[in-house]
C-alpha cells in the first residue's frame, strides 16, 4: 500500500509540467497610473529643502543609502544627481 501511494505521488510530480511564467519587470521601474513607466529614485530626506531636490535615479539592482527615501517619479531621465521633475514623484 505504501509503495503504491509513493509511486502515484512520484508519478504525479513527474507528470506536472512547468507553467510559463510572466516575465519579471525591470526593478528600476515603478508603477504610476497603472503603467510601469516610472523611475525609482533615492532622495536625501535628512537635508530639509535641498535634499528633496537632490534625487538620484537608482541604478539597476542597487539600493538607496541609509537616510534616503525612495520615490517613484515620472521622468525620462536616465540618471544624474538632480531630478528636475520632482513634482511628478510619488513618495
Curated annotation (Swiss-Prot):
Predominant place of localization: secreted
Lineage: superkingdom: Eukaryota
Subcellular locations according to the entry: Secreted; Secreted, Cell wall; Vacuole; Cytoplasmic vesicle
Function: Aerial growth, conidiation, and dispersal of filamentous fungi in the environment rely upon a capability of their secreting small amphipathic proteins called hydrophobins (HPBs) with low sequence identity. Class I can self-assemble into an outermost layer of rodlet bundles on aerial cell surfaces, conferring cellular hydrophobicity that supports fungal growth, development and dispersal; whereas Class II form highly ordered films at water-air interfaces through intermolecular interactions but contribute nothing to the rodlet structure.
Induction or repression: Under normal conditions on SDAY medium (Sabouraud dextrose agar plus 1% yeast extract), hyd1E is transcriptionally active during the first 4 or 5 days. Hyd1A is the most active at transcription level under normal culture conditions, followed by hyd1B, hyd1E, hyd2A and hyd2C in order.
Family: Belongs to the fungal hydrophobin family.
Disruption phenotype: Does not affect radial growth and multiple stress responses.
Protein name: Class I hydrophobin E
Disulfide bond positions: 30-72, 42-64, 43-55, 73-89
Glycosylation positions in this chain: 83
UniProt keywords, alphabetically: Cell wall, Cytoplasmic vesicle, Disulfide bond, Glycoprotein, Secreted, Signal, Vacuole
Annotated signal sequence range: 1-16
Amino acid at each position: 500500500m505504501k509503495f503504491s501511494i509513493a509511486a502515484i505521488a512520484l508519478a504525479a510530480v513527474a507528470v506536472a509540467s512547468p507553467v510559463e511564467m510572466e516575465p519579471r519587470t525591470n526593478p528600476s521601474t515603478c508603477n504610476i497610473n497603472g503603467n510601469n513607466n516610472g523611475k525609482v529614485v533615492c532622495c536625501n530626506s535628512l537635508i530639509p529643502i535641498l535634499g528633496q531636490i537632490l534625487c538620484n535615479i537608482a541604478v539597476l539592482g542597487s539600493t538607496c543609502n541609509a537616510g534616503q527615501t525612495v520615490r517613484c517619479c515620472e521622468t525620462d531621465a536616465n540618471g544624474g544627481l538632480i531630478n528636475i521633475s520632482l513634482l511628478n514623484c510619488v513618495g
